[in-house]
């Protein structure tokens, strides 16, 4: 596939630390990534040298300051959230609910920005966070915008995870519900994700 295994493993370690959101020990990281401790240590040590990972006094690892620096640079260089912000504010004020700017990345949705509405209905979406397509309003909007064959292929890649008892995990049922999203021009998530 043209990838370098050690770089891929290092990226997976960063992903783990990002998703967990709390410092992890070498033993925890090695176990979660199914790596020998010596391999995990070597990867973490290299990432620490480049300040992509930091190690606390207790020996636990977390994301490093260099990633924050890179994130700030990307944020400054990418105008989409800044340009969209006035429209999000206007929309949130008009409809009295939260307005969210998202992009689709494969089978996930990433939140770029959000503006809280003043009504009782609120969207809780972490900027920079990734959400599943099949059980979030943003994800359903993206799915509805695709050709049906493309949406079907995307949903058929892996089983649809049930996050709550209300999550639709049957691809055919979800595809049928997308017709309503197309007709009304918006999607609703009603206890399907959280």
Go through each PLM region and give its residues.
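Extended hydrophobic
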Residues: 170-194
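Amphipathic alpha-helical effector-binding/dimerization core
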Residues: 62-158
């Amino acid at each position: 596939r043209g990838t370098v295994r050690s770089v891929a493993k290092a990226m997976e370690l960063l992903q783990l630390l990002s998703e967990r959101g709390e410092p992890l020990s070498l033993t925890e990281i090695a176990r979660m990534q199914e790596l020998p401790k010596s391999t995990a240590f070597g990867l973490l040590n290299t990432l620490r040298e480049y300040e992509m990972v930091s190690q606390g006094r207790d020996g636990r690892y977390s994301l490093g300051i260099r990633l924050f620096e890179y994130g700030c640079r990307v944020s400054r260089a990418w105008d989409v959230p800044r340009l969209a912000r006035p429209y999000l504010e206007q929309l949130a004020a008009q409809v009295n609910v939260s307005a969210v700017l998202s992009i689709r990345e494969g089978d996930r949705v990433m939140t770029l920005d959000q503006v809280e509405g003043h009504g009782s209905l609120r969207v809780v979406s972490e900027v920079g966070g990734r959400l599943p397509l099949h059980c979030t309003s943003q994800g359903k909007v993206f799915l509805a915008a695709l050709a049906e064959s493309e949406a079907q292929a995307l949903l058929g890649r892996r089983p649809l995870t049930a996050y709550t008892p209300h999550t639709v995990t049957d691809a055919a049922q979800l595809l049928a519900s997308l017709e309503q999203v197309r007709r009304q021009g918006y999607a609703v998530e009603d206890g399907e994700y959280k």
